């Protein structure tokens, strides 16, 4: 960070109790995972706060983020692709705002808690035979 030309704009905040406010104040969220992960809660939270995510095509990230609609998906270990995606959103306010709205809508419609519970119950019923 100290060698970065943007060091004055990089903030390490440590432990905080106002994470929602900090998340909502961000322009872009970036999760540059290189290996498989599930549905990252940090991505979901960013999307709920209308912060467009830049994620890599690993694990559950592409399931959450519709590339070019609710965020940007780049190949893993593609530092230049990540930088280009962040810069694209940084330079285009309208696109950033549009993707932020689409991100929140995606979480609100495709990943509702109620639907997840119903799908989980249906899966259990399918996997576990009925004793009757």
Each model region followed by its residue ranges:
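Active-site donor-binding acidic/aromatic loop of nucleotide-activated sugar
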Residues: 7-15, 22, 72-73
